[in-house]
Amino acid sequence: MEVNILAFIATALFILVPTAFLLIIYVKTVSQND
């Protein structure tokens, strides 16, 4: 069970980190367009 939890956390971070990075770029782009 512990291994599954760690794998879930690792997967969540692997998905959330790039997503957050893309969102930051998107927000900056929209702000520049205004």
UniProtKB/Swiss-Prot annotation:
It is a single-pass membrane protein. One of its GO terms (biological process) is photosynthesis, light reaction. The chain crosses the membrane at residues 5-25. GO terms for cellular component: chloroplast thylakoid membrane; photosystem II. Pfam families: PsbM. The keyword Transmembrane applies. It is found in: Plastid, Chloroplast thylakoid membrane. PSII is composed of 1 copy each of membrane proteins PsbA, PsbB, PsbC, PsbD, PsbE, PsbF, PsbH, PsbI, PsbJ, PsbK, PsbL, PsbM, PsbT, PsbX, PsbY, PsbZ, Psb30/Ycf12, at least 3 peripheral proteins of the oxygen-evolving complex and a large number of cofactors. It forms dimeric complexes. One of the components of the core complex of photosystem II (PSII). PSII is a light-driven water:plastoquinone oxidoreductase that uses light energy to abstract electrons from H(2)O, generating O(2) and a proton gradient subsequently used for ATP formation. It consists of a core antenna complex that captures photons, and an electron transfer chain that converts photonic excitation into a charge separation. This subunit is found at the monomer-monomer interface. This is Photosystem II reaction center protein M. The lineage of its organism: Eukaryota, Viridiplantae, Streptophyta, Embryophyta, Tracheophyta.
